Structure formats: structure tokens, C-alpha cells
Amino acid sequence: MTEIRIELHSDTQTRPTPGMRKAMAEAVVGDEQKGEDPSVNRLLEMSKELFGNEDAVFLPSGTMCNQISMMLHCRPGDEVLCDKTAHIWSTEGGGAAVFAGSLIRPIDGE
């Protein structure tokens, strides 16, 4: 039996398939900052419907999502506890300190 491994710990581990590359090359695109990208607009509409929210925002990376989350939930001097293998500890550098004024404390997970 062939083992299939799916790596989800970081968006840097994924590679697009030939079909994905074809879809990207053929996609109708526009200026997302001006609300003119039909793919992003469709994604935002789907997200609003799925989660029952009145609006949505497109964030292009997991790092951006994590940093915004910490800025919203932490005050300067707060400490964020995370598993010692967490992306915010191992890969994102001092983003929490720079943007949220918070420190990351890695702990042993289970």
C-alpha cells in the first residue's frame, strides 16, 4: 500500500498540482485592493455565507493571520503560550514582539 503524506504544518510545504497551475494561469484577475478581483470576491462571499458574518477580509498568508490575531487579542507585555513546534515560535521570528508588544513562550505539548 502506498502511503500518502499530507503536510499541513506550514503553507510553505505545499506545492500546486499541474491542474492548480492551469487554473491559476487561466483565472480572471483584477485589483484585489480595489475590490475588482472576481476570485477574491467569490472567496469572501463564500466565507461570509459559511461563517454567517456580514463581511470578510482576504489575508494572503498564515503569518499575516497570526500577527493580526495577536494584535487583536494581546496587549503589550502579554505572553502567548504555544507548543514548542508552533509556527509562531519556530518560524515567525519576533513578529509578536514587534507588532503586538507580546512575547511568545514555547511549552512542551502532548
How does the language model describe each region?
Residues 100-110:
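PLP-dependent aminotransferase-class I/II
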Residues 1, 8:
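Pyridoxal 5′-phosphate
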Residues 72-90:
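Conserved PLP-anchoring active-site segment centered on the Schiff-base-forming lysine
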Residues 65:
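Binding-interface segments
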